[in-house]
Amino acid sequence: MNPNSKHNTNFTNLLKPSDSDIKQFAAQHIRHLTDLLNRYAYEYYTLDAPSVPDAEYDKLFRELEALERNHPELKLPDSPTQRVGGEPLAGFAEVRHEVPMLSLTNAFSPQDENGVFDHAEMYAFDQRVRDGLDGGKPEYVIEPKFDGLAISLLYRDGVLVQAATRGDGTTGEDVTQNVKTVANIPLRLHGENTPELIEVRGEVLMLKADFAALNKRQAENGQKPFANPRNAAAGSLRQLDSRITAQRKLHFFPYSVARQQGGFVAEEHIQELAYFQALGFSLPNGNFGCFKNIDEVLTFYEQMQQKRPELPYEIDGMVVKVNSLAQQRELGFISRAPRWAVAHKFPAEEALTIVEAIDVQIGRTGAVTPVARLQPVFVGGVTVTNATLHNQDEVSRKDVRVGDTVVVRRAGDVIPEVVRVIFERRPMRETAVAVSDGIGHRQDDLFAETPSANQTQSVPLHKPYRLPTHCPICRSEIEREEGEAVARCSGGMLCQAQRAQGLIHFASRKAMDIDGLGEKQIEQLVAQDLVLHFADLYRLDIPTLQKMKETADKTVAESDQMPSEGSSVGASGKHKKQPVKWAENILAGIESGKTPELARFLFALGIRHVGERTAKTLAQAFGTLERVRRAPEPVLACLPDIGTVVARSIAHFFAQAEQQAMIDELLAAGVAPQTQAVTIPPARHAEPQRWIARLPDFKISENKAQALWELAGKNIEGLQNDKALPADWQAWRSEPQNAALLENLKTFFAQMPSEDEAAQGSDGINKAVAGKTFVLTGTLPTLKRDQAQSLIEAAGGKVSGSVSKKTDYVVAGEAAGSKLEKANALGVSILSEAELLTLLG
């Protein structure tokens, strides 16, 4: 080849790409990553069938973030990085709805005390529809009426360009930046047949589980909790700082098309819903349907009313729509509502009644809860006679008093609560009032003005309620810690109420699961001082149980005239105690429950802030009771879903000598919690920069904590003794309690398994089960659902509520439903109960 040829001259330049080439490549790769990540999000949120692991998604996401940082001008409007939120706004712009966002007419089906519905209003709706169609026979679609915030999403050329709240129906607020953080709202529509323009109407809401997690974080951060998921969703969507919205998991379900140009032209509403899913939206699968007549609609409505408490989201009824879009147009609108749709509300969950008295209940942790005793009222399908007032702050805020007419709410299995007072109905009394003449009089001045009969004013009949100063059960002082909303009885296990509630919790199905020992028997044992501590349960015998039974049943007349249950009369006429089956069953239940799973045992102890989930986290992180007992607070605070407040509560519990003595007594009585597989890797909570950053009274970032660790030679001895460390650290470690904490940390980590040991299963992990995802469906022959879940989790597996491509096994019992069908369709392995037990070993 001629070295002077012009091809050879340009070869070097070809090896070095120009700035425009780099930019073109970056633009192409950004487009590729954006499309790829949006497709993965669609598979995850809409199809519930992810095709890549989370780690792969995260890796690609970080790659896209880096490219966009280097080339901000190339960032696309549908980039998934927008879901983390942007800079705060000064305010929300107004958006005028081209198609008004109208409301629906309500229909109600009252339910009598026998649970029978009166569907007269729905039959009337059906008749109006038929009349409007000149006797035509409509089909109906019924779907959930979500208790959230209505919004409108506008897409142009498949890209989300605007999101607006309903507002007054004509004008709403532009919340586009916030809506882009909602994970299951597509930023770019999917599929090939996307319209040039489409405006999708739907509801933004917060799932019940996400609401509970948010309120837990609010409480841990000393912030006011939200009253309900709807308020939480509305407040989150209207944040000026979209980064806050991004932290609060919101969800969206579409329910109608306001306008559309191009794309698939639906003839029925049920087709619209299917089109939504094809475009990338999520649907409330299994909770909507199309039916041929109103009777089928009402049957589904009643089924959904029963199913309501189990749903992952709040609904307050069902929306019924004429399916045919042509028939919808024919029926048209009346005022500001369509004739072809109705909001079929569930039976009232709120009702008016009168507060007859206010007293208090003492919980197992000593919490003093004011309770309103009510005139019986039928609400939410049951007769309600009591309602919680939560705490003194809530009583004062709502100003609930004896005699007040109040609104009571009961939703699903939630404890009834007093929502508000109807102040105009408050009972009043007339009282004399002295009117001053403006002249100062001595106390004995004969001319000083005195109240006259006609100088009166109305004042409330009853004074504002205040909690008692002493426990009504044990007379111990009621105390309220600074910053706490709840007041507590200081009596501990000396208080019969706390003792009874603590023992009931200890023996409950989700805790120690002591078969045969119910609330009634525990209350009787406590009332007679036969059981003072948890360990006393394991010292019970038949004579003690018989004594409990006889004392509880005995009346003055019976004690002289007739033998009690479990006794016989001998020739001498004296009562002779005989063993009875019920007592033997209780003792057998106590004995069989002596080897609980570690998570159940921890939950049973009644540690404040430790529910089932937190107990499982502790068991999975530490593996043995001894490690949990000795876990230092900073290490606890590093665990998933355990913040500083919960960590402090756990550490405080195990730091108390009486609690350690109580556990020792249980162990001495033969209780032996099982060893749990360590399935949360130690690195999750043992990385030095993490626990150092969580040391009490020493504020430091994780980056600075890492630097401190390296300065100390990467060992705790260095933290304890190195004199070259920063002065603020040396001052902190010089405090006796902090020096003791460092020594505790050193001892604790010496006993914890290493990362490799945990991975190799040195703590009894079942390698065939560890890290696998199981779904349970149907009724198993011998195991209850929670028993099967506990066995799987104890072996290191996970249990999910839905089937996806991530599912490893579906355990199917009798009457397995749609989960089994989906598992077969996805090729997921199906196990019987026997096969599960074999796998578990």
From Swiss-Prot:
Zn(2+) binds at residues 471, 474, 489, 495. The active site is at residue 145. This is DNA ligase. It catalyses: NAD(+) + (deoxyribonucleotide)n-3'-hydroxyl + 5'-phospho-(deoxyribonucleotide)m = (deoxyribonucleotide)n+m + AMP + beta-nicotinamide D-nucleotide. GO terms for biological process: DNA repair; DNA replication. It comes from Neisseria meningitidis serogroup A / serotype 4A (strain DSM 15465 / Z2491). Residues 554-575 are annotated as: Disordered. Transmembrane segments: none annotated. Belongs to the NAD-dependent DNA ligase family. LigA subfamily. Its cofactor is Mg(2+); Mn(2+). Keywords: DNA damage, DNA repair, DNA replication, Ligase, Magnesium, Manganese, Metal-binding, NAD, Zinc. One of its GO terms (cellular component) is cytosol. GO terms for molecular function: DNA ligase (NAD+) activity; metal ion binding.
